[in-house]
Amino acid sequence: GIRDYYASRGLGDVYKRQAIDCPVYDYSNHNRSDKVQHIEPAPVLIVEGILPFVEPELCAMFDYKIFVDTDADERILRRLVRDVKERGRSLDSVIEQYLTTVKPMHEAFVEPSKRNADIIVPNGGENTAAVEMLAHHIRNLIEKANMM
């Protein structure tokens, strides 16, 4: 994803409003695929992921840093369903990975990175008031950019 692109080539092109071809991660093979996602410059660019606020250089490129916080139980349930149904993994392998890698890494990197956010949205995407407020602000930014 975009963090992989940043790590390997730098996010500077996106920041300078230049088009990029971003590598696509293949979760079934645990590696980058041969595919790329072409990203055109836009008045608003939304970078999503679990680690965008870990790197200070990356944080400095964002006008707004929004952390969508989701309950730990919800995160593990989503992971179980996704990895078993969509990625063909066994329940045991998902639980093992969660306990040995995902949970410790979340606690070591993701959770502390919330400090770098400008806004923390509790209750994930279920927080209708926050989602509507952010959508309204993003629409205003796009309209303002289109007037220039």
Residue ranges and their predicted role:
Residues 1-3, 31-34, 51-53, 106-108:
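A generic local structural motif
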Residues 1-15:
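Single conserved hydrophobic/aromatic residue that forms the stacking wall/gate
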Residues 9, 16-38:
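Glycine-rich, often acidic-flanked micro-motifs
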Residues 10, 61-62, 116:
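Short, structured coil segments at secondary-structure junctions
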Residues 24-33, 45-50, 100-104:
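Short gly/ser/thr-rich secondary-structure transition/capping motifs
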Residues 32-87:
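ATP-dependent NMP and nucleoside kinases share a basic, alpha-helical "lid"
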Residues 40, 81, 103-148:
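NTP-dependent small-molecule kinase module
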Residues 67-68, 73, 89-97, 103, ...:
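Anionic, Ser/Thr-rich low-complexity intrinsically disordered regions
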